[in-house]
């Protein structure tokens, strides 16, 4: 590394340290109506089918996906 490399890097990052970081203005209200059992069941089932079912299929059929040696 060159002798000037730390000076160049310090010059590049020095101005970024002085920039103010804006805070997010997130305000939320309470829900208008509570979720029922049916909505929760449909939501959890759709998450399971979307994410876990394909991963389980691939893991259970891993031997068929491997290349023959």
UniProtKB/Swiss-Prot annotation:
**Listed disulfide bonds for this chain?**
none
Pathway linked to the protein: Energy metabolism; oxidative phosphorylation
Q: Give the matching SUPFAM superfamilies.
A: Mitochondrial cytochrome c oxidase subunit VIIIb (aka IX)
* Membrane topology note: Single-pass membrane protein
Mind listing the UniProt keywords for this protein, alphabetically?
Answer: Membrane, Mitochondrion, Mitochondrion inner membrane, Transit peptide, Transmembrane, Transmembrane helix, Ubl conjugation
> Principal localization?
mitochondrion
Which of the residues are on side Mitochondrial intermembrane?
61-69
UniProt PTM comment? In response to mitochondrial stress, the precursor protein is ubiquitinated by the SIFI complex in the cytoplasm before mitochondrial import, leading to its degradation. Within the SIFI complex, UBR4 initiates ubiquitin chain that are further elongated or branched by KCMF1.
Query: What subcellular compartments does it reside in?
Result: Mitochondrion inner membrane
The membrane-spanning stretches of this chain are: 37-60
Q: Where is the transit peptide?
A: 1-25
Does the keyword field hold Magnesium? no
**What Gene Ontology cellular-component terms does the record carry?**
mitochondrial inner membrane; mitochondrion; respiratory chain complex IV
Q: Which domain of life is it from?
A: Eukaryota
Q: Does the entry feature the keyword Ubl conjugation, yes or no?
A: yes
Q: Which GO terms describe its biological process?
A: mitochondrial electron transport, cytochrome c to oxygen
Q: Which residues lie on this side of the membrane: Mitochondrial matrix?
A: 26-36
List the ranges annotated as motif SIFI-degron: 2-19
Subunit composition?
Answer: Component of the cytochrome c oxidase (complex IV, CIV), a multisubunit enzyme composed of 14 subunits. The complex is composed of a catalytic core of 3 subunits MT-CO1, MT-CO2 and MT-CO3, encoded in the mitochondrial DNA, and 11 supernumerary subunits COX4I, COX5A, COX5B, COX6A, COX6B, COX6C, COX7A, COX7B, COX7C, COX8 and NDUFA4, which are encoded in the nuclear genome.
Looking up PANTHER family in the UniProt record yields: CYTOCHROME C OXIDASE POLYPEPTIDE VIII, CYTOCHROME C OXIDASE SUBUNIT 8A, MITOCHONDRIAL
The protein's role, per its UniProt record: Component of the cytochrome c oxidase, the last enzyme in the mitochondrial electron transport chain which drives oxidative phosphorylation. The respiratory chain contains 3 multisubunit complexes succinate dehydrogenase (complex II, CII), ubiquinol-cytochrome c oxidoreductase (cytochrome b-c1 complex, complex III, CIII) and cytochrome c oxidase (complex IV, CIV), that cooperate to transfer electrons derived from NADH and succinate to molecular oxygen, creating an electrochemical gradient over the inner membrane that drives transmembrane transport and the ATP synthase.
Q: Which family is it part of? A: Belongs to the cytochrome c oxidase VIII family.
Q: What is this protein called?
A: Cytochrome c oxidase subunit 8A, mitochondrial
């Amino acid at each position: 590394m060159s002798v000037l490399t730390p000076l160049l890097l310090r010059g590049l990052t020095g101005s970024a340290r002085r920039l103010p970081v804006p805070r997010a203005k997130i305000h939320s209200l309470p829900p208008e109506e509570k979720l029922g059992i049916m909505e929760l069941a449909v939501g959890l089932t759709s998450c399971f089918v979307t994410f876990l079912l394909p991963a389980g299929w691939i893991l259970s059929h891993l031997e068929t996906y491997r290349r023959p040696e």
